[in-house]
Curated annotation (Swiss-Prot):
Gene Ontology molecular functions: S-(hydroxymethyl)glutathione synthase activity; zinc ion binding
Family label: Belongs to the Gfa family.
Name this protein carries in UniProt: Glutathione-dependent formaldehyde-activating enzyme
Catalytic activity: S-(hydroxymethyl)glutathione = glutathione + formaldehyde
The enzyme's E.C. designation: 4.4.1.22
Organism: Bradyrhizobium diazoefficiens (strain JCM 10833 / BCRC 13528 / IAM 13628 / NBRC 14792 / USDA 110)
Cofactor remark: Binds 2 Zn(2+) ions per subunit.
Statement: the UniProt record of this protein carries the keyword Metal-binding: yes
Gene Ontology biological process: formaldehyde catabolic process
Residues that hold Zn(2+) 2 according to the record: C48, C50, C53
């Protein structure tokens, strides 16, 4: 039995244009959609297995990327946004009506990823943003109900479509976190 990873990757990766200038994210409401403008392309796009990220119906993973926070603007129906969990490091702003997470923001200025907002590229109304580059927090899908004996197949499928599976973030992002921590300790 094949597990649905995520609709945007189940049939393989669709490569980005390499020149994506940004676009508009729209929630899943039929009308009065929350719309969020994004300037520029995304970075560190990945499939995420954590239990905090928003996933479309039936998906095992979310697909999430980052953009500089100054490149994120709520365009329409911002009054429908609410923070999902005020105690979480990433303040996920979701539509109150449909539950779609529109962007996640870190307010702690000492956090290694402060200044980057987390978004779900599949919500772009436009095509061409960066394709997912890796899979993170893969083992965490067990916490959301995946059977442990399915994990080898999931990892194999991720590799087959071109996503290296990690049980944390990618090495480049882990290095960025460690560098931030080392600099903070040296200060």
């Amino acid at each position: 039995m094949t597990i649905a990873l995520h609709p945007s990757i189940d049939n393989g990766l669709k490569q980005g244009s390499g020149s994506f200038a940004g676009g508009t994210l729209a929630c899943k409401c039929k009308d009065h959609q929350v719309k969020v403008g994004i300037k520029g392309d995304v970075a560190h796009n990945h499939a995420c297995g954590c239990t905090k990220c928003w996933k479309p119906q039936g998906a095992t993973f979310s697909v999430v990327a980052v953009v500089p926070r100054q490149n994120v603007t709520v365009l329409e129906n911002g009054d429908k946004l609410e923070i999902v969990d005020a105690s979480a490091v990433i303040q996920r702003h979701a539509c109150k009506a449909c539950g779609t997470h529109m962007y996640g923001r870190i307010e702690n200025k000492n956090h290694p990823f402060y200044g980057l907002d987390f978004i779900h590229p599949e919500l772009f109304q436009e095509q061409g943003s960066q394709a997912p580059q890796f899979a993170a927090f893969v083992s965490s899908v067990i916490e959301s109900g995946v059977k442990p004996e399915q994990m080898a197949g999931i990892r194999s499928r991720l590799k087959e479509i071109g996503l290296e599976p990690y049980d944390c973030l990618s090495p480049a992002l882990m290095d960025a976190i460690a560098t931030h921590v080392a600099k903070a300790k040296a200060a």
